[in-house]
């Protein structure tokens, strides 16, 4: 079973409009509300793929109750309740444009943060792999993910970590390392304080920087150009076919689902990388975020090429 962790989930509300009129009333006929957050996208994709998944994270108030109720019934859930209210994130879809209004979310009390660590520790007993995704809510220390990684390491459970900015920096500077990280070029540039290109020789050098020491897998998305990956001392380039992109949002989360599934099933390097890329591409072909059509899985799978470089 895979444990997904979403520390700052949201109710994602979609308002489709023909036109967004400013400073007047806009009436919406077809409103969509879903359980949102990067970790919950991972959860949905794992469930659709057919893997057993347990979802956890922080929820609060009536919106927190709504969120838990709107997660697929096939998914096991064990969220931790806090005093603050789960946030709303609103997307206004007008014409070809998308305007987002994102609430900051609740402020987590120090004791709640400590109590979740105990909750997380107990959940580790019943899972084989952990996937941690997204931002940290206000109130938690910047190195909170390092604490989760430490507990998972102590329990002998591999961790796939998908976060960015100060939270990722804190983990990289910690003695407790996740099994997998998946930064993109922009995030690599931010971490190293210099521009990082997609040149394979440069990426090889970058991923051997001391900052990344001790991390077993580093998987770098190159968008339409595929993926560059480092596993131990071996480097890989994944070539992907061109596809019709409908909605790329959530493709990174779908990739995390594939990585986690590959670890769960102890797949070869090539199998893990292909599965991760295929699930990311399948998500990009769908309108709904964090959703894959498994009917197209094998067709794409057979087109991917993994080369050791």
UniProtKB/Swiss-Prot annotation:
GO terms for cellular component: cytosol. It comes from the Bacteria. It catalyses: D-tagatofuranose 6-phosphate + ATP = D-tagatofuranose 1,6-bisphosphate + ADP + H(+). GO terms for molecular function: ATP binding; phosphofructokinase activity; tagatose-6-phosphate kinase activity. It is an enzyme of class 2 (transferase). Keywords: ATP-binding, Kinase, Lactose metabolism, Nucleotide-binding, Transferase. InterPro entries: Carboh/pur_kinase_PfkB_CS, LacC, PfkB_dom, Ribokinase-like, Tagatose/fructose_Pkinase. The keyword Transcription does not apply. Pathway: Carbohydrate metabolism; D-tagatose 6-phosphate degradation; D-glyceraldehyde 3-phosphate and glycerone phosphate from D-tagatose 6-phosphate: step 1/2. CDD domains: FruK_PfkB_like. One of its GO terms (biological process) is lactose catabolic process via tagatose-6-phosphate. Its EC number is 2.7.1.144. Belongs to the carbohydrate kinase PfkB family. LacC subfamily. This is Tagatose-6-phosphate kinase. It comes from Streptococcus pneumoniae (strain JJA). The gene is lacC.
């Amino acid at each position: 079973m895979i444990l997904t962790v979403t520390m700052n989930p949201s109710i994602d509300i979609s308002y489709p409009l023909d036109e967004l009129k400013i400073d007047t009333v806009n009436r919406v006929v077809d409103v969509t509300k879903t359980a949102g957050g990067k970790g919950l996208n991972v959860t949905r994709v794992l469930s659709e793929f057919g893997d057993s998944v347990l979802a956890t994270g922080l929820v609060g108030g009536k919106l927190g109750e709504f969120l838990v109720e709107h997660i697929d019934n096939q998914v096991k859930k064990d969220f931790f309740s806090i005093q603050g209210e789960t946030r709303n994130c609103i997307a206004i879809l007008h014409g070809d444009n998308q305007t987002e209004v994102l609430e900051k979310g609740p402020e987590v009390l120090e004791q709640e943060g400590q109590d979740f660590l105990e909750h997380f520790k107990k959940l580790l007993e019943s899972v084989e792999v952990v996937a941690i995704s997204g931002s940290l809510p206000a109130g938690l220390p910047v190195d909170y993910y390092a604490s989760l990684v430490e507990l998972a390491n102590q329990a002998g459970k591999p961790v796939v970590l998908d976060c960015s900015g100060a939270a990722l920096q804190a983990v990289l500077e910690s003695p407790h390392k996740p099994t997998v990280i998946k930064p993109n070029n922009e995030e690599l540039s931010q971490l190293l304080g210099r521009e990082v290109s997609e040149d394979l020789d440069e990426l090889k050098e970058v991923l051997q920087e001391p900052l990344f020491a001790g991390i077993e897998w580093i998987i770098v998305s190159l968008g339409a150009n595929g993926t560059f990956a480092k596993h131990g001392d071996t480097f890989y380039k994944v070539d992907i076919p061109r596809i019709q992109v409908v909605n790329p949002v959530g493709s990174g989360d779908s990739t995390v689902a594939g990585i986690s599934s590959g670890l769960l099933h102890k797949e070869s390097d090539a199998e893990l990388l292909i599965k991760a890329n295929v699930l990311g591409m399948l998500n990009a072909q769908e309108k709904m975020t964090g959703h894959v059509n498994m009917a197209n899985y094998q067709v794409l799978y057979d087109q991917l090429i993994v080369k050791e470089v």
